Amino acid sequence: MRHQKEQYYRKKSGSLLSKVANTVVTLCMTVALMWGLQACSNVSALRFVQLSDIHFLENGSNNTFKMLGETPRLLDDAISQINEQKDVDFVMITGDLIDKPFEKELRAVLPHVQKLNYPWYFAFGNHDRCVGGYLTTNVYMEMLKEANSDFKFDNSYYSFVPKKGYRVIVLDDIITNEVTSQGYVDEKQLKWLKKELDKAKNDTALIFMHVPIIEPFASPNHRLKNASQLMGLIESYKNPIGVFQGHYHAARVVQHDNVLYVSTPALASYPDAFRLITVQNYKDKTVFELKWFETREKTIQKMAKLLVIASSIYTGEENERDGIYEIKK
């Protein structure tokens, strides 16, 4: 009888130890899983919208491939869609906010842009200023600062840090001393850019400009005159770099090793679209996720499509609209 009791207690004790061991293992696995999930959730992510070539005209007409008579409606719809998105860090307008470089047009468009729920910034386009006109760089910048408490810059090219691990660099590649649709980045700005890229060697650099370094399609009258020089400077750095451009009203994405070149189409002409970009910095890579938004003003979009030749040039390939691109570190 005593022997049977000893066996019973040994079995019970062994069973209890087994349960304790299983509980400890389960607890350890749970902690490890939670730590892993937390590590993933702590990835440094940045979300921003690129909105380009709005060509706002208060009383325009649709007599070109641009839907100038509809730009207020197109802009209001885009702003409404942007405001519906969550956790957007900023909105960047990459040039041609207005179609004609007049003060009254800038004053007319600013109340629309002020409806954005997120900080917004601006890069100059060739339609934003004119040679010898009243709407000079200084006047334009002062009007932007008056309308936008987040815009505190004195120069037409500038930089800021939106979040740890990222540096935003805005270039002004517009020629202001001659009437042209071409672009150029002068030596003074190139030296400044080098200093900014030096500061971002351990970060992800995000460069915004109007005239693209890589053309979505060939157009000698719209190209960046010193594109190869600018590309050489940017690609001499090995950290992840995204370059976001407009001007050609077309979608194009090209990756050169650690540099991703993204051209975004116009809001004012087909496909009447903009982008939401999410950038995530991991230890061994940086991931760019591009998401495409078209206008909900479908009647305007259909009309705009009829006004362009070879509409697929402007929409690009599917992965140039919605795509995920990785840059290894």
Regions found by a protein language model. Give the residues of each.
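Conserved beta-sheet core of the metallophosphoesterase superfamily
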Residues: 219-288
